[in-house]
Amino acid sequence: MLRVLFLLCGLSGLRTKENSERLHVQVTVPEKMRSVTSEGFETEVVYNIVIEGKTYTLNLMQKLFLPRDFRVYGYDSTGIMKDLEQQFQNFCYYQGFVEGYPNSMVIVSTCTGLRGLLQFENVTYGIEPLESSIGFEHVIYQVKNKNESISLYAEKEVEFRDLPYKVQSVQPREFSQYIEMHVVVEKNLYKHMGSDTAVVSQKIFQLIGLTNAVFTSFNITIILSSLELWIDENKISTTGDANELLYRFLKWKKSYLVLRPHDVAFLLVYREIAKYVGATFQGKMCDINYSGGVALHPKTISLESLAIILAQLLSLSMGIAYDDINKCKCPGSVCIMNPEAIHSSGVKIFSNCSIEDFSRFISKQKSQCLQNLPRLEPFYKQDAVCGNSIVEAGEMCDCGTAEECGRAVPICCNSATCRLEVGSQCAEGECCENCTFKERGQSCRPPVGECDLFEYCNGTSALCPDDIVIQNGHPCGENQWICVDGSCISPPEQCKSIFGEEVEGGTPECYEELNAMADIILGICGITHDGYKKCESGNRKCGKLMCKHTTENIIDIKNATIIYANVSGSICLSLEYKPDHLDAAKMWVPNGAVCGSNKICRDKACVETTYVNLGCTLQNCNNQGICNSLQHCHCNPTFLPPNCSAVDERWAGGSVDSGNFQGGGVPGIGGLTSVGTPPFIPGVPGVRRYMEDVYQTAKPTRWPFFLLIPFFIILGALIAILVKVQFQRKKWKTEDYTSDEQFESDSELKE
């Protein structure tokens, strides 16, 4: 296997503060021109600001990346983790552009004035409120490298890509993707950022906002699922190079981040001088064992540069390689995956090579974690209010007012303190009954449909376990269709849900004839800038949904047009909504519908399925269970997890995830000593891909071998002794030695 290592080296060129400076500092007063409000929150806002005597118009759209259950964690004096209960807003972060400048990007927060960056093609301006100003005055300044000739990287031959790439543009996928990230800030960076929890949190919010702007073209949102601050002491040693630190962090992550949901975790580390700026594993974004990274923050780089470092690490973890500047092109002066992007100002765009890499990544099953949709409604997080019937941070329960709590029988929650009453284990939840936890094994969430699974109370929590479903790609609907995200994707069933039980799925002739017409009413495969898109011959089962009318009744659906067409003696039905209607998606064959052998519909095209050759198969489950969405076996009754091989007649069925299993952890989750793919340490010009023999010299991969050397020496000695004893026994049976001297002489000779 080709093992690849990237090194970002030579950053000593950034040691001095003279390498960058703020120029043309001036005061401006932003003027709000208009805004669009939804449910009390500004979703769109327009500002005018003056820079060097010229007025610029900023068009901003709300960008939500803090989920409702977001938490900031710290540790108390005993080392126990605690919720720091920070007050913050998630609705005041915006992303947009400067009117009249197509290659521009604006990333600002409006929580307390305007704070953020205005990026033009080759220059970046920072804006922040002027402290103690009473007239909404802001400071605006240009950030520019003073000595751009400094080489930041080792002088070595560069070889970033082994495969040729097309130069033409490749459009990314249209559907949204989400990367849920847990960020850890180590002690020295916490001090460097201000030694204040609120200030550091806001800077991390700004960092994630800047990183989100980078991934706009991929329609990816970076969700900051939780933030952890190592205020007084680091939980692991942060010394050593990025490679060693990555292995150390992943080992810690495996033990301590299991209860905090995330797709990927990153440790941010401050260094006065750094030879490397980060490490991650290539293409391992959704692999629970390797979905992590380390980003080093050298003293003199800006938050904008740190965002590029983070974006490059995230890109590498999605299998997006560094650009070969001779083969890869982008509209901007510096592409994102060009290592020089870390030290250039202005807007940066992914190259055509990066877009192709990303398209390959999301077309595979291993990218599935990016499809989880978090809760992203606007909210304002403030101190917990006891008595509002909402359990908030710091509360064990909240049953409402004293009068409301008094109606409960029995009373589990103290209405004055929002703490559990003495003797109570819980106050509410699917697995709470009469103030105590329900016994393990009681069903708390029955399956909804044939692609869902049972969940059970675990006996130690009031909450039902997470909703786990059958693995994508499992056959359903009499083996004609497949499960996708817990639903059986069956066009015939969709026809029934829309038109009624008497309607059947459309005939092959309906799809073949009508979806080939490029007619908005009869059949299309989408709408483009050039008009209606005709379905190509291989995609006709993935365009407009076709159903078969079996009665003489006229169907009427509010706000929809029903189309009837006679094709080969069958009455074909299709549906037409306005494109912006809430139910417009019902017009189309759903993503995941089977359209051929090992093919499914995706974005109105019939493509090779990614739901085959998965890590979990029926054979892994001893043919006595099925695989769930976490690729663990959900075993039949009497057959026990994790692999459905052991038997217990009392077992009702389930998995290690369903709540009713009392066994240990899940075997087969490898540790760091079994790493099969080396980490990427993002590099800069002068860095090449190292082959396997070079990678094997890395410290984290050689220590297990040295631990085994004494074992092999001892084993060899034992084998030699046994062979010699057997040899001597044979001699004792055939020769009669009369003296020790003769014995020694014979022994030396025969040896």
UniProtKB/Swiss-Prot annotation:
<keyword id="KW-0130">Cell adhesion</keyword>
<dbReference type="GO" id="GO:0007155">
    <property type="term" value="P:cell adhesion"/>
</dbReference>
<feature type="topological domain" description="Extracellular">
    <location>
        <begin position="17"/>
        <end position="702"/>
    </location>
</feature>
<dbReference type="InterPro" id="IPR002870">
    <property type="entry name" value="Peptidase_M12B_N"/>
</dbReference>
<comment type="subunit">
    <text>Heterodimer with ADAM1/fertilin subunit alpha.</text>
</comment>
<protein>
    <recommendedName>
        <fullName>Disintegrin and metalloproteinase domain-containing protein 2</fullName>
    </recommendedName>
</protein>
<feature type="glycosylation site" description="N-linked (GlcNAc...) asparagine">
    <location>
        <position position="559"/>
    </location>
</feature>
<dbReference type="InterPro" id="IPR034027">
    <property type="entry name" value="Reprolysin_adamalysin"/>
</dbReference>
<feature type="disulfide bond">
    <location>
        <begin position="328"/>
        <end position="353"/>
    </location>
</feature>
<dbReference type="GO" id="GO:0004222">
    <property type="term" value="F:metalloendopeptidase activity"/>
</dbReference>
<keyword id="KW-0812">Transmembrane</keyword>
<dbReference type="InterPro" id="IPR000742">
    <property type="entry name" value="EGF-like_dom"/>
</dbReference>
<feature type="glycosylation site" description="N-linked (GlcNAc...) asparagine">
    <location>
        <position position="289"/>
    </location>
</feature>
<dbReference type="InterPro" id="IPR001762">
    <property type="entry name" value="Disintegrin_dom"/>
</dbReference>
<feature type="transmembrane region" description="Helical">
    <location>
        <begin position="703"/>
        <end position="723"/>
    </location>
</feature>
<keyword id="KW-0472">Membrane</keyword>
<feature type="glycosylation site" description="N-linked (GlcNAc...) asparagine">
    <location>
        <position position="147"/>
    </location>
</feature>
<dbReference type="Pfam" id="PF01421">
    <property type="entry name" value="Reprolysin"/>
</dbReference>
<feature type="glycosylation site" description="N-linked (GlcNAc...) asparagine">
    <location>
        <position position="566"/>
    </location>
</feature>
<feature type="disulfide bond">
    <location>
        <begin position="330"/>
        <end position="335"/>
    </location>
</feature>
<feature type="disulfide bond">
    <location>
        <begin position="635"/>
        <end position="644"/>
    </location>
</feature>
<dbReference type="GO" id="GO:0008584">
    <property type="term" value="P:male gonad development"/>
</dbReference>
<feature type="propeptide">
    <location>
        <begin position="17"/>
        <end position="173"/>
    </location>
</feature>
<feature type="domain" description="Disintegrin">
    <location>
        <begin position="383"/>
        <end position="472"/>
    </location>
</feature>
<feature type="modified residue" description="Phosphoserine">
    <location>
        <position position="745"/>
    </location>
</feature>
<dbReference type="GO" id="GO:0007339">
    <property type="term" value="P:binding of sperm to zona pellucida"/>
</dbReference>
<feature type="disulfide bond">
    <location>
        <begin position="616"/>
        <end position="627"/>
    </location>
</feature>
<dbReference type="GO" id="GO:0005886">
    <property type="term" value="C:plasma membrane"/>
</dbReference>
<feature type="domain" description="Peptidase M12B">
    <location>
        <begin position="177"/>
        <end position="374"/>
    </location>
</feature>
<feature type="topological domain" description="Cytoplasmic">
    <location>
        <begin position="724"/>
        <end position="751"/>
    </location>
</feature>
<dbReference type="InterPro" id="IPR024079">
    <property type="entry name" value="MetalloPept_cat_dom_sf"/>
</dbReference>
<feature type="glycosylation site" description="N-linked (GlcNAc...) asparagine">
    <location>
        <position position="643"/>
    </location>
</feature>
<dbReference type="InterPro" id="IPR001590">
    <property type="entry name" value="Peptidase_M12B"/>
</dbReference>
<keyword id="KW-1133">Transmembrane helix</keyword>
<feature type="disulfide bond">
    <location>
        <begin position="444"/>
        <end position="464"/>
    </location>
</feature>
<feature type="disulfide bond">
    <location>
        <begin position="286"/>
        <end position="369"/>
    </location>
</feature>
<keyword id="KW-1015">Disulfide bond</keyword>
<dbReference type="Pfam" id="PF08516">
    <property type="entry name" value="ADAM_CR"/>
</dbReference>
<dbReference type="InterPro" id="IPR006586">
    <property type="entry name" value="ADAM_Cys-rich"/>
</dbReference>
<dbReference type="Pfam" id="PF00200">
    <property type="entry name" value="Disintegrin"/>
</dbReference>
<dbReference type="InterPro" id="IPR036436">
    <property type="entry name" value="Disintegrin_dom_sf"/>
</dbReference>
<feature type="glycosylation site" description="N-linked (GlcNAc...) asparagine">
    <location>
        <position position="122"/>
    </location>
</feature>
